[in-house]
Amino acid sequence: MSFYNHKEIEPKWQEFWAKNHTFKTGTDAEKPNFYALDMFPYPSGAGLHVGHPEGYTATDILSRYKRAQGYNVLHPMGWDAFGLPAEQYAMDTGNDPADFTAENIANFKRQINALGFSYDWDREVNTTDPNYYKWTQWIFTKLYEKGLAYEAEVPVNWVEELGTAIANEEVLPDGTSERGGYPVVRKPMRQWMLKITAYAERLLNDLEEVDWPESIKDMQRNWIGKSTGANVTFKIKDTDKDFTVFTTRPDTLFGATYAVLAPEHDLVDSITSAEQAEAVAEYKRQASLKSDLARTDLAKDKTGVWTGAYAINPVNGKEIPIWIADYVLASYGTGAIMAVPAHDERDWEFAKQFGLDIIPVLEGGNVEEAPYTEDGAHINSDFLDGLNKEEAIAKMVAWLEENGVGQEKISYRLRDWLFSRQRYWGEPIPIIHWEDGTSTAVPENELPLVLPKTSDIKPSGTGESPLANLTDWLEVVREDGVKGRRETNTMPQWAGSSWYYLRYIDPHNDEKLADEDLLKAWLPVDIYIGGAEHAVLHLLYARFWHKFLYDLGVVPTKEPFQKLFNQGMILGTSYRDSRGALVATDKVEKRDGSFFHMETGEELEQAPAKMSKSLKNVVNPDDVVEQFGADTLRVYEMFMGPLDASIAWSEEGLEGSRKFLDRVYRLLTTKELVAENSGALDKVYNETVKTVTEHIEDLKFNTAIAQLMIFVNAANKEDKLYVDYAKGFVQLIAPFAPHLAEELWQGLANTGQSISYVAWPTYDESKLVESEVEIVVQIKGKVKARLTVAKDLAPAELEKVALADEKVQAEIAGQTVVKVISVPNKLVNIVVK
């Protein structure tokens, strides 16, 4: 019995593709271009898992399909290779993170090649390669020149025991560090910031121009968080000081009964009374120990301290107490709020807790019982009484501007991008700080500023990165003898991934980031496929850098990625006990179709869950390729369900995909192929070409594969197979199962050439309709025969065919036919007596 021998066939074709540079990017000016991009991976020590190939297979199917359609296709792969795990590994082992990273990349590349992806490896990029990060640094120097990169004192998550600051994501909910479990404190430190806020409006508006999932656009809109309102100035009683609050509801100013400053607000120390100084200092200390996330948790208890100072409400001259509370963040808005407890839940709870006034200014509800957060006519509001929300806002803004105590303001939730890390393993920031107090960017002709090699990667202890320990690299002298010190912060991992798609277009250019004509030819990216977890940060940062490069005249488009698609997650199998606790798969046994805990004997419930090392349910693609073959893995992952759905991995499903490929192999290697078309498969073949073509375009790969299965079933019922249909079918399955298709193609075409550039099959519209139909023959109202006849046969012809049928003749023998009623394409009714 013949079957698809993946262990022989797959390596053979992978070698052929590599040797012949089959997937080198086309440069034919007569052809249209298609750019298919994957989110490049961080090369971790764990290697690929089966979730990675889902997105990669999708872009690969599109790339192979477009090549066959006559496109130049750019389908590259590279490595987002700076990152914290490599630095931690280096600190733990004393090994060079570059060596660790290189080993991981080699392993990832081996795994990727084993899956038969049609990448153009001549365009491979690696964010840790100085020839690559020369241009990451170049972009930074341009941002610096334009005033979009600047230094600021910013509170960071400082861990004294680790001698370094850590990212928000590395702080555990209990306020300790993920690594080591040490206390984390908020400490102001000099940091580099990028002024992404300068692009807020464009980042928002240009979302209308791209074909992205609406859910992702909404996440970006919410992150940018545009709101229209007013800035209002509050004077502080008995001082010449004031502070500004931003509010989206200036119409409720008459209901502002207290103000709250962030504990870090510049004014706090200078306005605090002597009696309150101790309480304020202690509260500030406590707040510094909490993360922003913990501080703004809606469910947490309301805490705060009165400063002893009062502000003057500008609309009615009333004195209102100024408090500090940790739910107000210095980094958000102006770091100060006016509180209207009658109409805001958080303000109401705070006011109730501390016995502060609650004055309703909107009609409706009982504000002693609960805040009223609906709209209503204004009350207790002097010149706004009786007005609705829109009218009142407009009137109040006009009043504030007229009286010089406020103005209309558009505000954004978006903050500037904290761009520096106190780490070794990142791109050096190309800035020198001179002893005369000035700073300059490293000149372009001296880029890249190469990350110095060191075997001693340990925190400096001062809050600077380990680069501060490397004095030979650190200290520089200008031609005029002025001494300087290099910037010791490095860039975040986001830097290299914010522009990598541009470098793929021209990866070996030493003179510029990429050639303008090539950028014009390939941008924007036609399809970008990756996980939804990058919905906000990576995609927003890449859009920001792209717009900046557009303003510089480097790139020709406003947006980088025309179409974005998020593949779903491949879930593992997990088991839960009666308490809902997860049980690792190696502690589970299967008996009589049920699952039991090996140690306790308790019956367990099976449920899908995210693959994780702790649950021991991670599936390694190497094992799947070894047992079933790469084509099986590709077909299975595309057939599991819609590309954007999250679906549980199933061994049975994998076996089903393997059986399908074996059936394809048998059909095309054992069925007699003929040059004469009997017409039996005309409809199903043309339907298959049409469906597969349309569904690949729409990324509906599961239904495309289902149609291929329909063709195989139909072809298996025939004694012979028309050779042109056999060839067309192999071309249709090639994007999904390329190794199998190449092997079968050589048997059919015998050209020695790859199937990759053979023109995609077309379908004949006229063959999509049936040429024959089945009709029923009724005698005395009962069905006595079913006949296949030509479609649209005339009633008289239909009658002839029915009466000539042997079965019908036997039924009416010895009887007189009184009447025959013929309905084309449906039935013949014979009345006898």
Swiss-Prot record:
GO molecular function: aminoacyl-tRNA deacylase activity; ATP binding; leucine-tRNA ligase activity
Gene Ontology CC annotations of this record: cytosol
GO BP annotations, alphabetical order: leucyl-tRNA aminoacylation
Entry EC no(s): 6.1.1.4
Pfam families assigned: Anticodon_1, tRNA-synt_1, tRNA-synt_1_2, tRNA-synt_1g
Organism in which the protein naturally occurs: Streptococcus suis (strain 98HAH33)
Name listed for the protein in its UniProt record: Leucine--tRNA ligase
Annotated binding of ATP, by residue: K613
Intracellular or extracellular location(s): Cytoplasm
CDD domains: Anticodon_Ia_Leu_BEm, LeuRS_core
Keywords: Aminoacyl-tRNA synthetase, ATP-binding, Cytoplasm, Ligase, Nucleotide-binding, Protein biosynthesis
Motif ('KMSKS' region): 610-614
Reaction(s) the record says it catalyses: tRNA(Leu) + L-leucine + ATP = L-leucyl-tRNA(Leu) + AMP + diphosphate
UniProt-listed Gene3D superfamilies: HUPs, Isoleucyl-tRNA Synthetase, Domain 1, Valyl/Leucyl/Isoleucyl-tRNA synthetase, editing domain
Family indicated by similarity: Belongs to the class-I aminoacyl-tRNA synthetase family.
Motif ('HIGH' region): 41-52
InterPro entries recorded: aa-tRNA-synth_I_CS (IPR001412), aa-tRNA-synth_Ia (IPR002300), Leu-tRNA-ligase (IPR002302), Leu_tRNA-synth_edit (IPR025709), M/V/L/I-tRNA-synth_anticd-bd (IPR013155), Methionyl/Leucyl_tRNA_Synth (IPR015413), Rossmann-like_a/b/a_fold (IPR014729), tRNAsynth_Ia_anticodon-bd (IPR009080)
